[in-house]
Structure formats: structure tokens, C-alpha cells
Amino acid sequence: MLRVLSRRFYCKIAAKTNFKTAKLDFKELRYATKVPQTPVDTVFPETNANRVEIDAKTIQLLERLSLVNLDSEQALATLNSSIQFADKIAHINTENVRPLYTVLENQQLQLRNDEVKEGDCRVELLRNAKVTDEDYYVSPPGNIPLEQ
């Protein structure tokens, strides 16, 4: 109950605050953008496994779960390089790095007023779907291959 009240209190304060006049202050940033201006060489720690061996049973499982054919050598090479890259990322030291919710979490973002422009168009929206059930969209199951 306290959480709901505090959320409502914050919403009232945020609604009174004029965010439209607040602009993003990029002077606090080291650069004008988070993207480096010049290429940065990233050195990953060397791992012992240069090539990961994947057995046929695991490949069949991955094909069934992801609905991607891994028949060609190029697909297996891409899978292998992705696993190697994930292994390198797993060994990066992030001990003193604070997690971010967003890149601009210390900046005020502009909010717009919530205005209903169109409403009660449920029937028109449901006409766009191939299959509906009781005012819901029905999507195909993800674990069954589609007919080609």
C-alpha cells in the first residue's frame, strides 16, 4: 500500500514539473556522444578454448529450439565464433562497474502530456490479425516449424 501511495505522490510531483523546458546537458559527459570518435581496440583475455566442439545431439537441439537450420559449414562457423565471443565476454572483469538502467539515467527526459486522440478502436485493430480468440491475437507457437 505504501509503495502505491509513494508512486502516486511521485506521479503528482512529476506532473507538476515542467520537463518541456529542461534540456539534456551534455557538458557532464566526457564526449558529446557515448560512441567513441576513433576506433577502440578491445583486448579480451585469452581463453584456453580456441574451438568449441559441439556434438550432433546439441546441434539438433539448437536447431529445434531456435528454428534455424545449421546444416552448412558457414552456419556452424558462425555458431562457433558466437560461442567463442560469449566466452570472452564472460571473462571480462566488471567488479567495480555500476549497472545502468539507461545510458542517460542522470539526465531529465522530456515527457509529453497523456492525451487520448483515438479510442475504442479494438474492433478495427483485431481485423488486422489472421486469428483472434475472445478479443486477443493468436500467434503461432514458437516451437513448431512453419510450413515453407
Swiss-Prot record:
Family membership noted in the UniProt record: Belongs to the GatC family.
A single GO BP: mitochondrial translation
Annotated signal sequence range: none
Cystine crosslinks: none
Protein name as annotated: Glutamyl-tRNA(Gln) amidotransferase subunit C, mitochondrial
Chemical reaction(s) catalysed: L-glutamyl-tRNA(Gln) + L-glutamine + ATP + H2O = L-glutaminyl-tRNA(Gln) + L-glutamate + ADP + phosphate + H(+)
SUPFAM superfamilies, per database record: Glu-tRNAGln amidotransferase C subunit
E.C. designation(s): 6.3.5.-
UniProt-listed PANTHER family: GLUTAMYL-TRNA(GLN) AMIDOTRANSFERASE SUBUNIT C, MITOCHONDRIAL
